[in-house]
């Protein structure tokens, strides 16, 4: 079992699956230079007391400690600790004592981003808990130019939503929210205005699923749907699920969630003074823009392919994948017969840009990921150009082809039964995959024979 040490915001792990490969994760949440140490102990009387005694004997200042049952060994508990940065000179001997004298399993990590390192990535859906609260902006705090910056009631409300997201853990139902009348009015304005455009501007997949969301998830002008209801609906359609988040995540963390068919979703709504504008993703953007397409099997698979491609990818490729995501999932157009329709959530949740993108003003180019990945884009204005996909299936194959160019010493696949990402870097893993494929092919052949007869 791997152990984890986090020092000065840099986390890296040796993965037994990668031989001598090392992985790292950069994280700026720990600004005081403290060292984070994760270790596991057998569930027995006095086990933690031995560790605390070891720290005391070596004059180590323990500033924070959390515990939880181990997800890998039901007979152990995991402890997450912060140690004073002055611990560094004796850290090696402490880890040795934890292992040899106390019998702890220490999650050991390299503390440098070295050559041939692989960025850390979640291997289980539960590990999304590790970074879900490491938001880059907004959350409970607002920039001075935010429409709600000077509104103390709105800021307090945002803190309530942020607290829900911070306290959420995988497997829990998403807490239900009683939205205010003002919030419902804001939603109603956005809902009514956008719905009028969908029939002529949105893609078939969006228009096909939208009535089902109205029927089963409470998508109405006078009602803001609950994330838990929508998440349950998504799981029955494509296996995607929603997870509340307080604000913007890093590209690596956000894309990593997609690999597990998890969409990090905001629960708050934009400020009522500007119902047709938001400087950040809000529940209008998430539910009206993203959710209908995540309910489509082909689009869900396409989105997951982007997420899987991001796992263990170098930083420069994360930037490319984030750009691909921007020009597809957020601002993508697709062919539909002789017409072009919008499928990007940024378009489907913006009244102005949804009209603009299908006018003669922007430039339209075919989706070529090698070029798309390097294209600059604006986050404050309408896009000067959009990329047009032939179909979601075609876009999915292009993502797979692009993923093959990413320099990483392994391939990955998602196992929906265990909700784990499997690293395919040895013959045993490949044999398991081959057996799985063989079983599926057998089912296919059997079904074809019955259809013919």
Curated annotation (Swiss-Prot):
Record note on modification: Phosphorylation at Ser-16 increases basal activity and facilitates activation by the substrate phenylalanine.
UniProt pathway: Amino-acid degradation; L-phenylalanine degradation; acetoacetate and fumarate from L-phenylalanine: step 1/6
Catalyzed reaction equations: (6R)-L-erythro-5,6,7,8-tetrahydrobiopterin + L-phenylalanine + O2 = (4aS,6R)-4a-hydroxy-L-erythro-5,6,7,8-tetrahydrobiopterin + L-tyrosine
Notes on how activity is controlled: N-terminal region of PAH is thought to contain allosteric binding sites for phenylalanine and to constitute an 'inhibitory' domain that regulates the activity of a catalytic domain in the C-terminal portion of the molecule.
Residues with the Phosphoserine modification: 16
Alphabetical UniProt keywords: Acetylation, Allosteric enzyme, Iron, Metal-binding, Monooxygenase, Oxidoreductase, Phenylalanine catabolism, Phosphoprotein
UniProt-listed CDD domains: ACT_PAH, eu_PheOH
Chain positions recorded as Fe cation binding sites: 285, 290, 330
Boundaries of every ACT domain copy: 36-114
GO molecular function: amino acid binding; identical protein binding; iron ion binding; phenylalanine 4-monooxygenase activity
One protein family per Pfam: Biopterin_H
Cofactors: Fe(2+)
GO biological process, one term: tyrosine biosynthetic process
N-acetylalanine modifications at: 2
UniProt enzyme class: oxidoreductase
PANTHER family the UniProt entry points to: AROMATIC AMINO ACID HYDROXYLASE, PHENYLALANINE-4-HYDROXYLASE
Complex and partners: Homodimer and homotetramer.
Function: Catalyzes the hydroxylation of L-phenylalanine to L-tyrosine.
Annotated family: Belongs to the biopterin-dependent aromatic amino acid hydroxylase family.
Record-given protein name: Phenylalanine-4-hydroxylase
Organism of this sequence: Rattus norvegicus
